[in-house]
């Protein structure tokens, strides 16, 4: 089944490891007829913006999703980061377990959604600590 995506003007997305940009001043519809990793601009985290532990976890999962060739390397980075985070904040164990289950099932997009919850949790915890 094909997937229809509407890109807003100048919006970016990653499609199978390639950055696609809508260069038009109007929205554009894309029909994707092949199963490839897709990340919309709102879901893409740059390496420089991965400036917290949970964001680095998100970034590692993002790379697992779009860079199949180096997936093992990204998984090892994720495991190290997840272990460090759980040691520093044991309350994150539940989310980390769910993220890890998704990764083990090769469900990287759902893992990214869970990692967004982890980022929100970390940000809330840090704001309460201040």
Labelled PLM ranges:
Residues 1-130:
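Terminal leader/tail segments of proteins
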């Amino acid at each position: 089944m094909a997937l229809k995506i509407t890109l807003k003007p100048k919006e970016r997305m990653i499609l199978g490891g390639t950055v696609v940009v809508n260069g038009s001043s109007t929205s554009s519809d894309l029909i994707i007829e092949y199963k490839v990793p897709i990340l919309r601009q709102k879901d893409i985290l740059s390496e420089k913006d991965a400036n917290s532990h949970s964001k680095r976890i998100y970034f590692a999962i993002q790379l697992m999703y779009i860079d199949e060739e180096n997936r093992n390397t990204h998984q090892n980075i994720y495991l190290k980061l997840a272990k460090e985070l759980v040691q520093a904040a044991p309350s994150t164990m539940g989310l980390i377990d769910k993220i890890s289950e998704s990764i083990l099932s090769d469900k990287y997009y759902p893992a990214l959604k869970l990692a967004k919850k982890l980022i929100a949790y970390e940000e809330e915890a840090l704001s309460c600590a201040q």
